[in-house]
């Protein structure tokens, strides 16, 4: 597995992403990833908190307006995340925490889709399990993402 990761890491794009002084290279990608996380996590956290009863004056159906914000954040994170993986493929793809992060994000997306199809379309209050799961998954996505720079097992770049 490592040999194909080394090939990606030796590519011109991977090297440029890691080593370029251009602001739109690695630092810019990190900024886009952070903004995407803010949009996705912020909107899903707002949904989860409202569904748990916080800010009851906001109608549940108004939460539907946050769903596109979450999708925009997810799209930004997918695009920037792919570039971050290209920059350090060995570091990312040999780290079990990376796969946990992806699993958590897929689960959070499933919860948001469930909410969008049901609860957010009517003014009914869901059980506490779904919004609690959404908040926990949102927090786990952030935590696992923040752990990635510190939990890698293999780093090929620069050797």
Residue ranges and their predicted role:
Residues 1-159:
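Polytopic transmembrane helical bundles with strong interfacial aromatic enrichment
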